[in-house]
Amino acid sequence: MKFDNHTYIQNYTSSDDETIVLINPLILNLFNKTNYDISQSNKQKDSIYHLDINIKTNSKLDKKSKKIDRNQDEVDELAKSKTKSKKKVQVEFETDDEYLNVFNKPKHFDIVEKNIRKTEILNEIKTINSATGKKNKKLLSRKKEEIVEDNQIPKELRINSSLTVQEFAELTCISDIEIIRTLFLKGQAVTVNQILDINTIIELGKDFHINIQIEEKNGLNEVNIEKNNFIKFSENTIRRAPIVTILGHVDHGKTTLLDKIRQTQIAQKEAGGITQKIAAYKVNVQYKNENRNIVFLDTPGHEAFSNMRSRGINVTDIVILLVAADDGVKPQTIEAINAIKAAKLPIIVAINKIDKDQANIEKVQQELSKYELIPESWGGQTPMIPISASQGTNIDSLLELILLMADIENYQAIEEDLASGTILESHIDRTRGPIASILVQNGTLKLGDIIVTGTSLGKIRGMLDSEGNKINTLTPSSPGIIWGLNKSLNSGDKFQTFSNEKDAKTYFSKESENNKKITYNYISENPSNQILEESSKKILNFILKTDTQGSIEAIVNAISRIKTKQLQIKILYSNLGEVTETDVEFASTTNAFVLAFNTRLAPGAKKTARQLNIDIREYNVVYDLVEDIESLIAQHSEPEYKKLKIGAATVKAVFPLGKNFVAGIIINEGKIVRSAHIQVQRKSGLVFEGDITTIKIVKKDVEEVSEGNECGLFIEEFSEWKVGDSIEIFELIQI
């Protein structure tokens, strides 16, 4: 089909049927405002039918089309090269049925089949883009809209890494503009090429009612597994220090034990006396007349920090399970036992606080035996050492046992290799920017190396060891802190380093492809009931700013455990760093509370908060934050009551009182009190339920009337009394 010397329609033949395909999106606006005539010519019995489509346009559209044409010389050339006829295009049909099927299709732009394959539209986009450059963004956007319309938004999306805005848009069939707008309303300005972290993707999924499922990454993990297998059989290896993770219930003495080993006082300095971040330390020990090193990972015991404990287990060689002799096996103890068994790690049980009066070592051993941890003294295979972390009792024996076990396992590494390991924790520093706590598991990390994780690439510009000293290298089984990165790294990610940017980028490109293996699962159930249920609840909005990514995980985990029937708790966004004026302004727009955990307020943020009357709540202990949110929920929730029946009455007469009516009642059983809650019943059922306004005997207000007596009952919200109405009287007891 031709219009103003441009080809807009070409023949397209598929195995299913014959359709007419538009090859220039300019026709989208023109086609609905045109009139066309269809005529049929029948030449002979075996002749082929011809379908003639003649386009007539109005003058206004003609002028608009000419104006567009003047700016599209390249499009004209492209269009002319595809033109076969000046005035019309002939579509051939081999049978009568094929011809008649054309007339069953809608007589407007829907003549273009909606089942055009996505790849064909994308090819047209490429053609338009190469021919027109930046002049026809509208044409490209229309084509992209066609793809979105023809695809279903998935109900579930499985991912194993971060994604860019554009990648998320393509995978979910949601416009990238809509995604950018949604994030902007949450206070996060992004571009189409910006990488979205896992938490942000999960929040977007909630906004668009997509269930985001996180799958385990394979790329770097597989590389490290292969490398570990190679190390075991390599001749060019050295003995490395064992990595030991201390696990146990909160307040069972994990950090106190580490303090005694390191001769430090970390436990006394921790907020609330509990560990709230994963920490790694290298300790020097005298063993068999030589200096040996042990790397200790101290993990939080609070239930909210389960992700941190998992990270500790994933990188450890040996686990010390700490159980308090005066407290026994607790929920986080059981969680740790199950995780250790799943990982098939060597375990040493340290029974702590044996100096306490309530200490009962045998009881602890009996409790542990229920979980198949049988002490060696009972004929089992689990070494158990009674210790006192505060007094230092049997600490040397514990260290000797760790090194003995390490010698048996024979942990090895290749020092000359480029470094690989795990990101333990990350946070934002005001002066240094993104900072990561890492553990080198193989090779040597050097200042200036390029570090690659599954989702990021950056150059190391500074390093500290576990004691806070500036260093230039980190050897195998060494914890440290690095900075100079362009973005915050994901806690728990594996990393690999390179000495030059070219190799790093090549490796990063391959890893990015490996990490984008994503599957869909379209859920057939209609989620509308859940949406309606949530929409009927009041919403408490929060903005969360923390010191580390681990803190975000722990707080979100803790908040998700809070049960509430009347309110919906919504974390609008969570980020690392200080509370800024932008956070405060966004909180004002969304009526949100700002939660600042172990972080400060930027200059001007406090002043802006006062001006906008925004509540910024600061915490340094996760217990306090959770308790405060529970208190907020109670304040914003309607109290719940249970009904206790205390009496019954019957309406004997109805009297006018101004514009309302008063019921004259007799108490048949129990009593009626001024503070009571009543239900009025008739043959038709319940006609009123509510509270009493006043009770009168003659003209005197009274608080209570007992069984067998009469009184007047006035209720401000109800006056449709009828003689014979039954009244049930309740006392409301708050639950």
Curated annotation (Swiss-Prot):
Subcellular localization, as worded in the UniProt entry: Plastid, Chloroplast
Region (G5): 388-390
GO CC terms in record: chloroplast; cytosol
Annotated stretches, region: G1: 248-255
Biological role: One of the essential components for the initiation of protein synthesis. Protects formylmethionyl-tRNA from spontaneous hydrolysis and promotes its binding to the 30S ribosomal subunits. Also involved in the hydrolysis of GTP during the formation of the 70S ribosomal complex.
Region (G4): 352-355
Gene name as annotated: infB
Keyword Transport recorded: no
Similarity comment: Belongs to the TRAFAC class translation factor GTPase superfamily. Classic translation factor GTPase family. IF-2 subfamily.
Molecular function GO labels: GTP binding; GTPase activity; translation initiation factor activity
UniProt keyword list: Chloroplast, GTP-binding, Initiation factor, Nucleotide-binding, Plastid, Protein biosynthesis
Listed name of the protein: Translation initiation factor IF-2, chloroplastic
UniProt binding sites for GTP: 248-255, 298-302, 352-355
Pfam families (UniProt xref): EF-G_D2, GTP_EFTU, IF-2, IF2_N
Region: G2, residue numbers: 273-277
Region (G3): 298-301
Keyword GTP-binding among UniProt keywords: yes
Chain ranges of the tr-type G domain: 239-411
